[in-house]
Amino acid sequence: MCTSIVEVVGADGAGKGGDGWFDLTHPVVSYDHPHHALLEEAITIDFVNAALGPGARVAVELTLESAKELSAALARAIAAAEIEESARLRQRR
């Protein structure tokens, strides 16, 4: 079943592909048939820089449960990073 679930957001960072590191422009998050993982459906995250061609891509295919765990881990890390950033800003004042 094709779900047509696709989310695209801008990104400022870097990814490491087969040819080394490259600047990221955006990740594409989808829920559909995976290309490699032996799953019926998967959350797929493609970190890309379209201007650099198809080699500038890092792809991840996750089970829905693994994606939920990753999302929760990201939320915890972001919350902790925001506390660190706030403390750093207070020290500069």
Question: What is each stretch, according to the model?
Answer:
Residues 1-93:
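Positively charged, low-complexity terminal tracts
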